[in-house]
Amino acid sequence: MPFALGQRWISDTESELGLGTVVQVEGRMVTLLFPATGENRMFSRSEAPLTRVIFNPGDTVESGEGWSITIEELEEKNQLVIYHGIHSETQEKVSLRETMLSHNIRFNKPQDRLFAGQIDRLERFGVRYQCQLLRHKLATSDLLGQQGPRVGLIAHQQWIAHEVGSRYAPRVLLADEVGLGKTIEAGLIIHQQLLTGRAERILVIVPDTLRHQWLVEMLRRFNLRFSVFDEDRCVEAYADNDNPFYTEQLIICSLDLLRKKKRLEQAVDADWDLMVVDEAHHLEWSEDAPSRAYKIVEALSEVVPGVLLLTATPDQLGHQSHFARLRLLDPDRFYDYDAFLAEEASYKDVAEAAEALSQDKKLPDSAINSLTELLSEKDIEPSIRLIQSKDVDAESQQAARQELLQELLDRHGTGRVLYRNSRASVKGFPKRLFNAYPHDMPAQYVTAERVNAMMGSAKQPQAKAAQALSPEKLYQAFENDSASWWKFDPRVDWLIEFLKSHRSKKVLIIASQAETALSLEEALRTREGIQATVFHEDMSIIERDKAGAYFAQEEGGAQALICSEIGSEGRNFQFASHLILFDLPLNPDLLEQRIGRLDRIGQQNDIQIHLPYLRDTAQERLMRWYHQGLNAFELTCPSGHVLFNEFADELINVLCDDDEDLMTQLLNHTQHRYKELKQAMEQGRDKLLEINSHGGERANALIKRLSDSDNDTHLIGSVIRLWDIIGVDQEDRGENSIILRPSEHMMFPTYPGLNEDGITVTFDRETALSRDDIAFITQEHPLVQTGLDLITGSETGTTSVAILKNKALPAGTLFLELIYMADASAPKSTQLYRYLPPTPIRVLLDKNGLNMADKVDYASFDKQLSAVNRHIASKLVNASQPILHPLLAKGEEYAKESLTQLVVDARAKMTQQLTGELERLEALKAVNPNIREDELEYIRNQMTEITGYMDNSQLQLDAIRMVLVSHV
């Protein structure tokens, strides 16, 4: 290489050093000073990994003094280049010697890097292009946000997430029965809202006992890093902001924190996009006296655009409280309780019509009349004829039924604000088998009851009933000895024998009180050394998590977990299938919640429910009412709350007084009313609600698409190649899993999310679901997203030179492959990416400037190419510069044409989708007040904003590859 003092060169291996200057040429060695970093490098003159920097006419370059010149011509004098051109500020003619060039010039544009000899390996060009295609594919997918979470592909959960998560500021009550996965539904919606940019700031309000569980669940299943806020965290946050809630984007807190006036005011002022309230059945309301908890959530719901309320028991605090929760979501719609009741009464006709449409039978006249009346603003006669015709194929008839059913769901009832799936509509649950074990009443309890009766304590009936259900509490009150009762209680003897005979089984034990749970643990430990752990409301979150983990542990873990009523709320242990009810709660909803700890989707075995009880006591009578009256042990009982309210007085009387005639009468009345309510529920609103909530065939089609996405081998191959290029160590661990570790040769100094110890990953959903310690990799996972960002955000793969060995073409034939990115910058919340995401535009030019991209696809072209040594590649580029410059200009013309068409297509797609959605919602608003005006306004504004951003779309050359034909 000819070197001369003052020449400017760049290091091929250390481009970060900037422009180097030749300061010494001696014998076979050359020394360069890199003024930007102050470092010297000595190279062999014959093999120096250096590229001479010579700019071309049309380039604008910066001088060392800070001014710029637009080059018009070059002059070479004494082996140094002098640039002549126009001063960028004064517009005067100036000259600039190459020694006076800025030391900090970076070759960021692909064409500059190519001409400066900064040429990447062939495979990196391909990986960069694949990364851009992957990002484009993900951005345009309507499944964005649903593919990545570590959850099972359960139809009703994914359907609700798809329906609700795609809305602007969704305001919804998720009220699936216990065990159907409301937390997962909420997590899917949160994940989707975040990934699509519909929400950025999210507040989750949960009972104090569930804060840590939500934190772990959001991270483990959804890769979302929430922060738990309590009073201490709020005080700490003052160092960063006067309002502690502004210090994090994703926050979990308890209702108790917000009971403090100052904290509530700060939360109200914190500009949330979405609020999630778990266990919303605790929000009690009456027109005269709404609870403090209700008023807290109401204050937030008035300023937060999106609200999700989660409850398994909508009517637990009465129908008024259920109405009040709907009122939180839409106060304009649910303004009057009496009007709400009157509307509910009309649901029967709607449900009958929906039932008729959902069955593959001929529509009866009554159903046709109902449909005609209910959809009076729409001409449904053609659809009815299609359904009733014998000459039409089944697929067309089914489509007509689905269309009418959707019209019905859209126009009537609470379908857009309330989702409730029942076990009757969701398959895959195990059986519940009830086992009762009677025992004689111990003499000590009999004596305690007699003494209590003689003392004539004036207790309210409900308090007397509660006392009768827990004789050990009464005994303790007299004996003042909290531990001794377990030494003679036959239920404890039975419990010990049961655990001894089921040593290999995990057993969940639930009792009403924390004191009872602690006493039982002491009994098991001291009498038989049985490994058990407790779980109650007085324990810290960390202590409860440790207890839960100890119970879940296969080897050396606890055989039994003993929970109190409140302590077990919201916790799930479906890896166990034996449930022991040490006592019974005086509320059928609480009984269902107990059983729901095991009876959940994901339970692999039939559930064995065991109840040891004391014969001829209130315990036996309550057991009979639950079992014979409600069948509440073996089936879920949606009407349990209503029945309890109706028969509470009679039930409490029976519990307090042993009167078999009264008991028989109560059972007869309960059974009769149970059947009535069951029939009414089957005929009424619930059927329509379930059709809307589980999604039917549309939900199944959604699951099919998600499953196909899981099995996309092309995606898996692309991700593995991405990690190869970055330099991540990959060790096959078997069982569908790989261990990823950072290596010494990684392309980037750090890879966020990949720590030094490594991480075990899988592309298989089932493996991820069975192993919490293995990360589930999809294109939505942060490790993949970060990898894509590392490549596309750097200069990796922006230049390449390759040889095409093809004797059908003349040797020396040149092709120029250009990858442009079409991009319209806009806030994520506009949803512009749905119509015009960053889009790769490929241009493949021959030496005459003809674009052959449509005729020669990327994959087949890429397979025929061979790599070229970087120094040879640099020489080939320099020799081809006279051809390349006009080709670059021609390529940009083709790319601009493609961009224009992209914008036209994107605008048409946006107009079609959003106008269609707007017209649909406007039509529905006329007949269904559930459609909120702000939803319509959001769509109108979205159309205006997106159009403006599309008009400002930009083109940027992202990568360039020069290809030469060779016969060698």
Swiss-Prot record:
Listed InterPro entries: Helicase_ATP-bd (IPR014001), Helicase_C-like (IPR001650), Helicase_RapA (IPR023949), P-loop_NTPase (IPR027417), RapA_C (IPR022737), SNF2-like_sf (IPR038718), SNF2/RAD54-like_C (IPR049730), SNF2_N (IPR000330)
EC numbers: 3.6.4.-
Cross-referenced SUPFAM superfamilies: P-loop containing nucleoside triphosphate hydrolases
Residues involved in ATP binding: 176-183
Domain Helicase C-terminal intervals: 491-655
GO molecular function, one term: helicase activity
GO process terms (BP): regulation of DNA-templated transcription
UniProtKB keywords: Activator, ATP-binding, DNA-binding, Helicase, Hydrolase, Nucleotide-binding, Transcription, Transcription regulation
Pfam families: Helicase_C, RapA_C, SNF2-rel_dom, Tudor_1_RapA, Tudor_RapA
Residues in Helicase ATP-binding domain copies: 163-332
Main EC class the enzyme belongs to: hydrolase
Keyword Transcription regulation: yes
Chain ranges for the short sequence motif DEAH box as given in the UniProt record: 278-281
Cited function: Transcription regulator that activates transcription by stimulating RNA polymerase (RNAP) recycling in case of stress conditions such as supercoiled DNA or high salt concentrations. Probably acts by releasing the RNAP, when it is trapped or immobilized on tightly supercoiled DNA. Does not activate transcription on linear DNA. Probably not involved in DNA repair.
Subunit record text: Interacts with the RNAP. Has a higher affinity for the core RNAP than for the holoenzyme. Its ATPase activity is stimulated by binding to RNAP.
UniProt similarity note: Belongs to the SNF2/RAD54 helicase family. RapA subfamily.
Protein name: RNA polymerase-associated protein RapA
Organism, as annotated: Shewanella frigidimarina (strain NCIMB 400)
